């Protein structure tokens, strides 16, 4: 289950609700329940993962986001999230979330850990923008290890929007 090391005491009720919702989304991602994750997204949400690797993307719409989450799930099985820092602010109609997160998993049979910064914009509780800034050097090394271990998808280029 996704965990939060950061304290959320002393913050507004809206921020505490945002933190619980965020953790539920990470927990769903841990279990591969990407439909549940996408229920938290607005229909035209934009996901930006800054990278030249297989996880790199600038996508919008639930169908393309599902493709990204499915690839993420295949490349990082048995993932676990730990939120180290969490900040939420703004009214429910224009809320911003920033989180510093650690992912632990297995890459080609060896323990793997990476950190990323996660920035979300929500409108009325739905994610409209999801920006992920990950330790790209660590992920690029992991991608090469995955490809060498028989996961050719790890060597593929970033996802492009599906043709309409």
What are these regions (language model features)?
Residues 2-164:
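C-terminal and inter-domain tail/linker signature
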């Amino acid at each position: 289950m996704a965990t939060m090391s950061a304290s959320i005491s002393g913050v507004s009720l809206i921020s505490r609700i945002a933190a619980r919702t965020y953790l539920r989304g990470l927990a769903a991602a841990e279990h591969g329940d990407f439909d549940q994750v996408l229920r938290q997204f607005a229909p035209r949400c934009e996901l930006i993962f800054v990278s030249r690797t297989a996880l790199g993307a600038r996508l919008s719409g639930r169908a393309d986001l599902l493709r990204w989450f499915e690839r993420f799930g295949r490349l990082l099985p048995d993932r676990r999230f730990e939120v180290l820092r969490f900040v939420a602010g703004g009214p429910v109609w224009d809320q911003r979330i920033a989180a510093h997160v650690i992912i632990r998993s297995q890459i080609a049979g060896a323990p793997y850990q990476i950190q990323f910064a996660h920035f979300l914009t929500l409108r009325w509780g739905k994610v409209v923008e999801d920006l992920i800034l990950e330790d790209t050097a660590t992920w690029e090394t992991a991608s090469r290890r995955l490809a060498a271990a028989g996961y050719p998808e790890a060597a593929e280029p970033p996802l492009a929007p599906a043709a309409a």
